[in-house]
């Protein structure tokens, strides 16, 4: 049993570290599908964007030419500014936005690409300063 678990761990580790990473400047778009350069197969892997100084500004996972997985945006100081999850180019789950200090600024729940649930905004001390409820992208009164 130990040997099987070790083999599975090694295979999953190799696969996890072999994900292809490209810069956003290498991408081309055809019918809303992402490709790298003139490749014929839709891109699967990680896309990174950098500013003119070479600082990472964004990172997103793609599968079959569509955003699929984690998407992160960074402040110029390198700290995380926002994180969201996508499935086949559709935003799902809770988007989290952060102050430059790293503290949570907002949480916005998404379902099928639309805000759905209670969105919350926080001050820098972590206190909820606003709450708004949405259903299928529409504010609930």
Protein language model features and the residues they cover:
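Glycine/tyrosine- and acidic-biased, solvent-exposed loop/turn segments at the edges of beta-strands
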Residues: 14-141
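Sec-dependent N-terminal signal peptides
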Residues: 4-13
């Amino acid at each position: 049993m130990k040997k099987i678990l070790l083999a599975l761990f090694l295979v999953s580790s190799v696969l996890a570290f072999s994900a292809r990473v490209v810069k956003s400047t290498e991408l081309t778009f055809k019918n809303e599908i992402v490709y790298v350069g003139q490749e014929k197969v839709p891109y699967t892997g990680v896309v990174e964007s950098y500013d003119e100084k070479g600082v990472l500004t964004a990172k997103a996972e793609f599968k079959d030419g569509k955003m699929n997985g984690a998407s992160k945006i960074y402040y110029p100081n390198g700290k995380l500014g926002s994180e969201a999850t996508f499935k086949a180019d559709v935003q799902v789950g809770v988007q989290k936005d952060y102050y430059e200090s790293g503290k949570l600024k907002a949480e916005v729940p998404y379902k099928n690409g639309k805000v759905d649930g209670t969105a919350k905004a926080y001050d820098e001390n972590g206190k909820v300063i606003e709450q708004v409820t949405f259903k299928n992208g529409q504010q609930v009164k």
